[in-house]
Amino acid sequence: RPGKETVFGPAHLVVEDVPLPLAVPYGFFPFNKNYSSGFIMPSYVDETVRGFYLRDGGYYWAINDYMDLKALGEIYTKGSWGTSVETNYNKRYKYRGNVYFSFLRTVEGEKNMPDYQVTKSFKLQWTHSKDSRANPNTTFSARVNFASESYERKNLESMYNPLSYTQSTRASSVSFSHTFPTIGLSIAASANLTQNMRDSTIAMTLPDVSFSLARFYPFRRKYSVGKERWYEKISVSYTGQLSNSITTKEDKLFKSNLVKDWRNGFQHRVPIDATFQLFKYINISPNLSF
């Protein structure tokens, strides 16, 4: 039946155009239009520092047609463990994105010995994009790639992947903008973060907001009657920016003081212009900005 299942009669197996003496009397393949949830079997391996472990086992949940969720875990015989959660979402003609979070608790050495060490590390990744057809006057996007300084050194995949150590910096950004067409006002806001993985230095700007108001004529009459007055030619526009930034170490970021450690400020510009005609032949264009 079209769209339901496929049924076939007697068949034999062929590998690289070579028929094999393996046959089946019939076959039945149903079509399933829905995503399926289920358990993910872990892998069992031995690692020198952390011992035997079960890794990448968990559960996949097909929440609906727009979102899924995958939760994985890993556990080691010498006390280390980790977990990760990843979700994908996609709303057609509106937005799409992916979120990934991983946490590791790594135990190295023997307890009560000088080399004993417990390290907690994490990684957060988020990508999001908005379809312009959903709302042409609004944009929102995110590209976040943040990890604690010790994550790549403790993550098992990175330990055996030399390319991961070549990435010395990580960059993250989240941006939003909205335009009010009826009044000519535009607002844009963003948060940016650059992370140096070698010395755990973080440069963050949170937030960075800009405003702009299109040129308008405040003294122009709503209903113009007769000749245009001289003051009706005066135009005004506006731009402004608010910024708040800091450069610090990873372990000091949440202990920083907004007044002492952060650099913040606000600047704006208000241009006032006009164009007048003198004696029908000379144009005068005075302007003032503050």
Where are the language model's segments positioned?
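Outer-membrane beta-barrel proteins and related beta-barrel translocases across Gram-negative bacteria
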Residues: 1-290
